C-alpha cells in the first residue's frame, strides 16, 4: 500500500471493528504499515483473518459480534492479552438493509407496485440502527473503559448522508446522523479523560459491493452514477486510499491532538453542494 504520508504508531494498539470489510480492512493495513499492533474484529472471522495475515505478526483477527456485549468483552480480553492495552478504537461496523430501503425517491398518490415509505419494515429499521449505532455504543462501552485511565482515541465512521440524507435509505441516513451526534457527545463526555473522539464521513466510493450499481457490464456509467457525479463538485468517485490520509491524521496525537468532536467529510464536496 502506498501511504499518503506515514506516522509512527509503534507501540500503539488499534482495535478496528468491521475489519473484514473493504474500507476498514484497508484502514487496518495502513495502521499496520505505520507500526501499530492491529486487532481486526469482525463477525466474519475468515475475512478478518485473511487481512491480518497480510499485515503480519503485529495483527490478530478476532471473531466479534458487535451487537453482543459478551462477545465484545471476550474480544477485548483477547486484545489485552495479546497487546496489553487499546490506544485507538475505530468503530467501523455498519451497513444498510433492503427492508429499510425505498424503491423510489418520491412518494406519489398514485404510486403502485413499488416499495414506498409505508412498505418499509420495522425490523429493517431496527436492524440498521442496531448495526450502526447500537454496535458503536456497545463497543465503545467496553473498549473505552480502559482508556479512562490511560487516555485514548476513538474514531467513528459516519457518512456524508448524515449531512444530506440519501433519498432511498432513510434508516441508514438517520443512523449515520446518529453516529455523528454520538461522536460529538463522546468527545465532550470523555474530554477530561484525555480521550479524543472524531468521525470520518466518507462520500461515494467504488467497492466490489456497489460496482454493479455504478457501472454497467460494458463499463459505462449507470444513471445512478450520473446523478452522483452531478452532485459531486470534484466530478469523480473517491478511492479507498483517499480516506487513509484523514485516518492517519486523526490517529496521530502529534498531528491532531487538539482535534475532537469533529465529523470530517471525505466526499469530493458532495455534502457542500446545494445544486443551485
Annotated model-derived regions:
Residues 5-39:
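Canonical Rossmann dinucleotide-binding motif of NAD(H)/NADP(H)-dependent dehydrogenases/reductases
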Residues 73, 96-126, 145, 168-171:
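Conserved mid-core segment of classical short-chain dehydrogenase/reductases
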Residues 109-137, 155, 179, 234:
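Catalytic Tyr-X3-Lys loop
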Residues 140, 175:
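Active-site helix of classical SDR
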Residues 151, 191, 196, 258-260:
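Short, small/polar-rich loop/turn modules that mediate ligand/substrate recognition or access, typified
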Residues 159:
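Residue(s) in the substrate-gating loop at a strand-loop-helix junction
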Residues 165-173, 185, 213:
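Active-site loop-to-helix junction immediately N-terminal to the catalytic Tyr of the SDR YXXXK motif
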Residues 236-266, 271:
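C-terminal substrate-recognition "lid" of short-chain dehydrogenase/reductases
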Amino acid at each position: 500500500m502506498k501511504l499518503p504520508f506515514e506516522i509512527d504508531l509503534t507501540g500503539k494498539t488499534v482495535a478496528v471493528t468491521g475489519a473484514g470489510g473493504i474500507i476498514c480492512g484497508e484502514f487496518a493495513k495502513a495502521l499496520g504499515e505505520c507500526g501499530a499492533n492491529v486487532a481486526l474484529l469482525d463477525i466474519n472471522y475468515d475475512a478478518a483473518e485473511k487481512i491480518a495475515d497480510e499485515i503480519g505478526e503485529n495483527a490478530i483477527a478476532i471473531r466479534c459480534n458487535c451487537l453482543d456485549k459478551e462477545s465484545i468483552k471476550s474480544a477485548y480480553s483477547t486484545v489485552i492479552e495479546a497487546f496489553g492495552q487499546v490506544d485507538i478504537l475505530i468503530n467501523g461496523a455498519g451497513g444498510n438493509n433492503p427492508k429499510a430501503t425505498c424503491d423510489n425517491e418520491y412518494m406519489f398518490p398514485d404510486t403502485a407496485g413499488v416499495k414506498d415509505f409505508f412498505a418499509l419494515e420495522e425490523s429493517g429499521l431496527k436492524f440498521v440502527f442496531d448495526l450502526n449505532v447500537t454496535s458503536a455504543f456497545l463497543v465503545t462501552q467496553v473498549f473505552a473503559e480502559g482508556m479512562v485511565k490511560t487516555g485514548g482515541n476513538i474514531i467513528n465512521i459516519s457518512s456524508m448522508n448524515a449531512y444530506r440524507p440519501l433519498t432511498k435509505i432513510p434508516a441508514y441516513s438517520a443512523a449515520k446522523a446518529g453516529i455523528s451526534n454520538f461522536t460529538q457527545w463522546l468527545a465532550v463526555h470523555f474530554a477530561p479523560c484525555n480521550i479524543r473522539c472524531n468521525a470520518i464521513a466518507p462520500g461515494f466510493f467504488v467497492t466490489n459491493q456497489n460496482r454493479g450499481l455504478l457501472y454497467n457490464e460494458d463499463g459505462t456509467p449507470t444513471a445512478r452514477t450520473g446523478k452522483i457525479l452531478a452532485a459531486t463538485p470534484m466530478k469523480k468517485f473517491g478511492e479507498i486510499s483517499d480516506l487513509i490520509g484523514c485516518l492517519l491524521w486523526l490517529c496521530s496525537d502529534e498531528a491532531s491532538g487538539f482535534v475532537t468532536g469533529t465529523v470530517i467529510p471525505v466526499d469530493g464536496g458532495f455534502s457542500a453542494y446545494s445544486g443551485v
